[in-house]
């Protein structure tokens, strides 16, 4: 890439670009590790508020070490003084990519993703961080079906001064909790739970819970309307999952589940009840499900998620089918050759 260089890294292709920055793939020259690098555009690196938000994002990511959160490897300024940071490279796309490619996802996949997202949210909330922009596009996927929460660019750190002016609305409109829309200064992790409800609804049905065509219409629906139950659209949705989504989409924060860990436990209970997952360490019936990572659960939903990722990327299952067809073809050729030899004899 022409222009500023990052010492120690070989920059690769552009993964994504926005109004304030670009994300590149890169290789650590010393270790050969593939990483992603997020760098602010030169035009905004000197903007005090944008720079402060970017530095805040780095500070937050440095604190949040969790298997379901994008890993942070450090950051600083490039040779031209533009801010950047280095993070884990996740190559399976995003939940948004999956929804775009397949539409509605199987409820087993939704339960699995929900459990993993809750694990990430609980870690963030335990550290006093409210994401404020939870949406399918910020839920990244590894090739083996691990969900990674990323993009903490507008996250709120309750232990630091707020960079958002009081009464200002921040977030993505389709996933914003009522208290975000009204600019409530006392916003809590319950806002992320509302956004989680929107995400689960969309994953399960292939559509957002509210379909307003303008921002005012959308805000009005978030504040006062009730969406159709997910089970009215998604065939086979367990009633327990339906109820979890209804609870998450409650208008008042106090009417939503107590915390992300509580929702995670409900997801595990659904998985166990319908025998799609087996908890390797402790049953939800013990009441001791604290923070269950992907590696602790043998989950049909995760294997289904992995197959969806492979199908979208054109890897895995397609390759296996090709090899099976090749093996059958070779076997047929061998049989035909033997038959030909027998006929000649």
Each model region followed by its residue ranges:
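C-terminal lobe helix-coil module of Hanks-type protein kinase domains
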Residues: 172-278
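Conserved N-lobe ATP-binding subsite of Hanks-type protein kinase domains
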Residues: 22
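Protein kinase catalytic-loop region centered on the HRD/HxD motif
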Residues: 119-129
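AlphaC helix of the eukaryotic protein kinase fold
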Residues: 41-63
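A short, aromatic-enriched beta-strand patch in the conserved N-lobe beta-sheet
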Residues: 74-76
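Activation segment signature within eukaryotic-like protein kinase domains
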Residues: 113-114
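Conserved short submotifs of the Hanks-type protein kinase catalytic core
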Residues: 80-94, 98
């Amino acid at each position: 890439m022409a222009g500023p260089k990052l010492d120690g890294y070989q920059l690769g292709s552009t993964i994504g670009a926005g109004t304030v920055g670009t994300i590149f793939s890169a290789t650590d020259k010393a270790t050969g590790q593939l990483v992603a690098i997020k760098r602010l555009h030169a035009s905004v690196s000197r903007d005090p508020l944008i720079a402060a938000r970017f530095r805040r994002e780095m500070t937050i990511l440095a604190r949040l070490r969790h298997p379901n959160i994008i890993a942070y490897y450090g950051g600083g300024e490039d040779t031209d003084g533009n801010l950047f940071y280095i993070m884990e490279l996740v190559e399976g796309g995003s939940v948004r990519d999956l929804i775009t490619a397949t539409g509605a996802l199987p409820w087993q996949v939704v339960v699995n993703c929900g459990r993993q997202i809750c694990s990430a949210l609980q870690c963030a909330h335990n550290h006093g961080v409210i994401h404020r922009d939870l949406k399918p596009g910020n839920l990244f996927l590894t090739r083996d079906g691990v969900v990674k929460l990323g993009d903490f660019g507008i996250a709120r750190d309750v232990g630091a001064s707020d960079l958002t002016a009081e009464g200002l609305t921040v977030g993505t409109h389709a996933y914003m909790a009522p208290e975000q829309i009204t600019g409530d200064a006392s916003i809590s992790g319950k806002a992320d739970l509302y956004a989680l409800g929107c995400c689960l609804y969309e994953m399960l049905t292939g559509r957002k819970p509210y379909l307003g065509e303008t921002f005012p219409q959308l805000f009005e629906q978030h504040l006062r309307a009730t969406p159709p139950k997910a089970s009215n659209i998604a065939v086979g949705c367990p009633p327990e999952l339906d109820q979890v989504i209804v609870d998450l989409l409650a208008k008042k924060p106090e009417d939503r589940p107590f915390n992300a860990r509580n929702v995670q436990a409900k997801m595990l209970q659904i998985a166990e009840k319908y025998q799609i997952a087996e908890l390797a360490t402790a049953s939800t019936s013990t009441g001791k499900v604290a923070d269950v990572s992907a590696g602790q659960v043998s989950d049909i939903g995760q294997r289904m998620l992995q197959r969806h990722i492979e199908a979208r990327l054109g890897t895995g299952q397609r390759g296996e089918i090709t090899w099976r067809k090749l093996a059958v073809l070779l076997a047929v050729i061998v049989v035909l050759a033997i038959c030909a030899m027998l006929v000649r004899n």
